[in-house]
Swiss-Prot record:
Belongs to the purine/pyrimidine phosphoribosyltransferase family. It comes from Latilactobacillus sakei subsp. sakei (strain 23K) (Lactobacillus sakei subsp. sakei). This is Adenine phosphoribosyltransferase. One of its GO terms (molecular function) is AMP binding. The keyword Transferase applies.
Amino acid sequence: MSINFKDYVASVPDFPEAGVTFRDISPLMSDGEAYAAATDKIVEYAKNKGVEMIVGPEARGFIVGCPVAYKLGVGFAPARKKGKLPRETVSASYGLEYGKSTLYMHKDAVKPGQKVLVTDDLLATGGTIAATIKMVEELGGIVVGTAFFIELKDLNGREKIKDYDIFKLMEY
């Protein structure tokens, strides 16, 4: 049976501000069959890459990455916001509409030479994923691909990570 994943995405106009259409993956996550099928598609992609570790940024990267890591039998390393990790970290900043934000990872989260898949719910401007990739590489990891439920094409996030393989289930 083939699932049309877009049937499980709620499009909310004018959220969080006028002119923006928010793509809500909550319906996808709340439907066990659809969530499992979406996860399985990313698992299939990851198997072909020889993935040894999944890394995902807070918070929705966890939603995508953790079940993929579980299915593959590999670890998951979170990229967190400030003050969330108790041990020594590396960090990378990225631009926001007004200012910047910073993500952190434990220094031992990724081993040198480890093949890493970076996951998130969606690829928008690419800043979060680019920052996550920067930390993985600083730790010596090899980013073998990126995976998303959704790519928002008009925001050109692909440009920030153009040197990496990109897998997405759907695009808007």
